[in-house]
Amino acid sequence: MSDIIRIKRHFYVHLLNNNTNVTKCMLGPQVYTRKEHERCLFEPRQCVVVPPGHYCVVQNPCVRGEDNIPKVGESEEVQLRMGEKEIRFEQPPFPLLPGEELLTVDGEWLFKLKVIPSNKGYHVRCTRDFVDSTRVSVRAGEQWIVEGPQTFIPRVEVEELGEVEALTVESNTAIKLRARLNFTDRQGVARVAGEEWLHRTSGAYLPAYEEEFVSYVRGAVLTEKEAIHLRALRNFTDVYGKARKAGEQWMITHKMSSTHIPDVNEVITATVNAIILSKNQYCIVKDPVGDEGINQFGKREVRKGECSFFLRPGESLVGEVQSMNAIGKNEALLLQALEKFEDCGGTVRMPGEKWLLRGATEYIPRVDVCVLERRGVIALDKNEGIYVMNTTTGEVRTVIGEPYMLKEHEVLWEKDLSPDVEELLACPTGCCRCSERDPNFTSSRVKHRIIRFNVQHNAAVQIYDYKQKKPRVVLGPNLVMLSPDEEFTVLSLSGGKPKALNSLLALQLFLGPRFSSDTIVVETSDHARLQLSLSYNWHFDVNRENPDAKIFSVPDFVGDCCKTIASRVRGAVAAEDFDSFHRNSAKIIREAVFGRDGNGHVRNSLRFSANNLVVTNIDIQSVEPTDAKTRDSLQKSVQLAIEITTKSQEAAARHGKERKDQEARGRLERQKLVDKIEVERTKTQWLELQAQSEVVQASGQAVAEAKAKAESLLIEADTELKQAEMRAKALRITAASDLAKQKQQQDLELEFAKRQNELEIVKARELAQTEVERIQRMVSAIGRQTLVSIAQAGPEMQAKLLGGLGLKGYLITDGKTPVNLFNTAQGMLGGQTTETKS
């Protein structure tokens, strides 16, 4: 490096004095001649330039005095603060003094100042004590938030921990904050560590470091139909200025505020909807709140419409909102007193007392009255009824054929029947087979309705009265109604073939005539066992005027009758051999069943005196041996007879078939001959037609050519004729079109001229009218007297002028201007006439 160092403006170099080992800084612009004991440590460097909005960090900065000039030691060396850092902001370019260094991060030494936007801040912490211009003293470890909008000015004593965003507090929303330590917030309120509070102001809020965000608290919207219940968590004064005790509950409605944000010292226990009662509604409130704001536990209150209210804390609704009891003319309410009270009519009601409130009226029950049920008039036809029990005496009676309303001491009594009777009543005929019964049958009968049963024609029903201990028999057709103490007599009859016990249940006994069938097994004297299928016709001999209960004396009259007849038949058959019985079975069985009279004749009927049952006829439907051998021999004989009959029928059928075949073959041969004759006739006709065709074919070609040529000429002539017609038609259409066009044009021109003339006439008329109006308006504007004066002004002036000149008249003319002597003479005559008159 040369001894002459040229230092430009804003450049510097460091020179080391080898004698004193002290480095000094030379700042341009200058030209410096290096001495022998001095050494230039580097080429001239540009001064450090910090532009606006930037800063740099200088390590080991120099010590400056109050005048901001670096301090120099005894050896003229610059004093440094070793290990320190200094942040330098925008200033004139400056050199780095010996010992000073620029702090570089990732090769960059110039840093841009950070701008803190609105609603944001920087969380910073003090690393060592210092005194700030805004803070008297800042101790190491303190933390705070630098709020925007501003430019963040860094300090070496402060480190940046991170960026903090502001919290947005929306309308009807608050944020819950908690104190990290004891401090005084921005509103000047002293906060204790752990204390929580709400920030309710809408907008952006940047919490201080001492404030910890807990959560957002959304307010409850209060309307005419919604309110909230609150409970105090601790003693405090709410936002409405009212002192609250811990555990106290209260209600906030829309009358106090449209919205409510719950404080940290209170909690929403419930959101309640308004109970709206119309004019015809009411409700019962349990534990109502009194005038002092305290629940009256154990009490109830009836609230009637029209109104709307909210249930306060501790209150509850008994049941639901109920409609006012509108009692019709044929209705009543059964009421019961819960406590002793005096009603509006002055009647004292004792606890448990019941009474009826009859309509027509409207009724809202008191809190000490219980509505047991609504009763109405039960409409009953003449064949309908109900069972009514007196709850005081226990007596049960029937009400039939008239509308009835139960009294306060009466209830509907349900009459129970056995399952058999219930199922039989559900059957149309009043009877059913045991095999067809439904095990899951459930009666749909209304039990308090009187039990009715339609007795069919020619049937009887027995009803037993347990109170009077006697039965009664009803013959059909009739309608039976049971009193409370009566029951049906159920018949259990035998059924099937052979008869089986308890196969059929019935409420009514059919009197007949009817029939029964049975199958019995008998044995002849030669030990042939036979199975007989018998049918009996029977009926009951009953006095219609006074039926006797004797017909119901035998519960299973079918089984008893069949057993009796079977016994008699077996006895009679046992005395006969098989052949004799097979030939005379009907006579033997009829004689055995009916017996003989005193004259030895077979009777016509069998009478059972126990129940007046009469069997009038017996029919043998079939007789079959039960022994296999006997059955086989009978089957063989029957089969042999069938075979003989079948063979004779087959022979007759074969003979008839052969005869029909011969007749068919004859008809077929005859038809063949007829067909051959027809074929020959058709062939002859075909040959004749073929000959005619050949003749036509021979002369057809010349005729065809002549016809074709003639037709061609005819077509050409027709074509020319049609073309001429078309041309004439076209000319005619063109001429007609031109004529119509000219006519239309002339009509339009004539119409145009006519309208133009009319317009001219209208125009002239309107101009004349306008001129007349103008003259009239001018005359009316000038005035008649004025016009007269104007008209007389000329002659008068001339007369005066002539009078002044002493002339009677005058005439001025030359040789070129003619004189109208006629007018002059007339004027003269007029003048003379005037003078004569005057």
Curated annotation (Swiss-Prot):
Cell location: Cytoplasm; Nucleus
GO cellular component, one term: cytoplasm
MVP repeats: from-to residues: 13-52, 53-114, 118-170, 171-223, 224-278, 280-328, 329-381, 382-426
Keyword field: Cytoplasm, Nucleus, Phosphoprotein, Repeat, Ribonucleoprotein
Major localization class: cytoplasm
Superkingdom per UniProt: Eukaryota
Gene3D superfamilies per record: 2.30.30.560, 2.30.30.570, 2.30.30.620, 6.10.250.720, 6.20.380.10, Band 7 domain (3.30.479.30), Major Vault Protein repeat (2.30.30.550)
Chain's role: Required for normal vault structure. Vaults are multi-subunit structures that may act as scaffolds for proteins involved in signal transduction. Vaults may also play a role in nucleo-cytoplasmic transport.
Complexes and interactors: The vault ribonucleoprotein particle is a huge (400 A x 670 A) cage structure of 12.9 MDa. It consists of a dimer of half-vaults, with each half-vault comprising 39 identical major vault protein (MVP) chains, PARP4 and one or more vault RNAs (vRNAs).
Descriptive protein name: Major vault protein
